[in-house]
């Protein structure tokens, strides 16, 4: 990158914002669904046949997005508290193995990310720096336990495993959608209304009643009031048989309020990919120190 391009990119995307955005994309890289639903109405209210948790879980699993290789291009906008940045991402994935990203602004690459099951790495090409570590820092930054499976699922609209076993998952219906949760909705409202606290985090998945694709994933920890809310919409048919969410929205409320909006413009399935990633010898390692 020449000096002029480097200066211009740095002005648009300062290092501290770039690092934060890269980490957010690495940690994520899970509105309501707007496609039409053929729901029976009675006096303006939808009517859905009740399904138990076993049936809903089976339908959820059967309709999850399946792939071995994935290549995509997407635009993203991140807001950390009141600071907003937009950028484009070239994404490549091999299921259960590698997530690779090239993050650019105005056509200039500013960062490259490589995520595996046990490591998170990225290079900052603007300042000749790199980060190499595990999920510990990302988890602390977002106040949430993160792992590879969670990141992979959230990037393609698949389910994230519940903390509790399947026998404790409660079925329900909310706003013309099926739900699966670790706490029933009426109990959740009762607890919140009386200002009580639950010892375990509450988790819910919302399902489109026709396709059984996920429209929302919600995690809520009552003490100290942390939440993660993911929405998936604009499902399109890919590979002639599968629905893929072309728009995603993530909202994290913790020490910082973080919002990420993603819109895919291209998704290609099951073409073998490469994951070019190299840390030049002259790059300086980024070391994040915990606040005392």
Residue ranges and their predicted role:
Residues 35, 39, 168-284:
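Gly/Pro-enriched, hydrophobic low-complexity segments
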Residues 98-149, 288:
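An acidic-aromatic
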Residues 1-33:
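Sec-dependent bacterial lipoprotein signal peptides
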Residues 33-83, 287-292:
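N-terminal leader/targeting segments and the immediate start of mature chains
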Residues 126-197:
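Flexible, processing/modification-adjacent segments and terminal tails
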Residues 62-70, 81-85, 92, 113, ...:
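Edge/loop elements at the starts and ends of beta-strands within beta-rich repeat scaffolds
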Residues 76-80, 126, 252:
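Transmembrane beta-strands of outer-membrane beta-barrel pores
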Residues 80-84, 103-112, 223-227, 253-259:
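Solvent-exposed loop/turn segments connecting transmembrane beta-strands
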């Amino acid at each position: 990158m020449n000096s002029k391009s480097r200066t211009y990119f740095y002005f648009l995307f300062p290092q501290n914002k770039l690092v934060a955005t890269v980490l957010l994309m690495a940690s994520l890289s899970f509105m309501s669904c707007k496609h039409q639903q053929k729901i029976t109405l009675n006096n303006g209210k939808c009517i859905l046949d009740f399904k138990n948790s076993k049936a809903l879980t089976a339908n959820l699993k059967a309709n999850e997005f399946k792939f071995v290789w994935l290549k995509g291009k997407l635009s993203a906008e991140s807001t950390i508290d009141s600071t907003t940045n937009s950028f484009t991402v070239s994404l490549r994935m091999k299921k259960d193995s590698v997530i690779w990203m090239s993050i650019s602004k105005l056509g200039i690459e500013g960062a490259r990310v490589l995520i595996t099951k046990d490591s998170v790495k990225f290079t900052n090409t603007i300042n000749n720096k790199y980060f190499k570590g595990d999920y510990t820092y990302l988890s602390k930054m977002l106040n949430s336990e993160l792992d590879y499976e969670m990141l992979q699922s959230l990037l393609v609209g698949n389910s994230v495993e519940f903390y509790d076993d399947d026998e404790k998952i409660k079925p329900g219906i909310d706003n013309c959608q099926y739900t699966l949760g670790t706490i029933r909705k009426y109990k959740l409202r009762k607890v919140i209304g009386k200002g009580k606290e639950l010892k375990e985090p509450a988790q819910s998945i919302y399902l489109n009643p026709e396709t059984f694709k996920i429209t929302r994933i919600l995690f809520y920890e009552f003490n100290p009031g942390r939440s993660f809310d993911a929405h998936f919409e604009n499902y399109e048919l890919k590979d002639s048989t599968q629905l893929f969410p072309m728009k995603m929205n993530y909202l994290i409320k913790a020490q910082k309020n973080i919002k990420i909006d993603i819109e895919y413009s291209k998704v290609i399935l099951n073409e073998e990919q490469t994951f070019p990633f190299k840390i030049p010898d002259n790059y300086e390692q980024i070391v994040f120190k915990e606040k005392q």
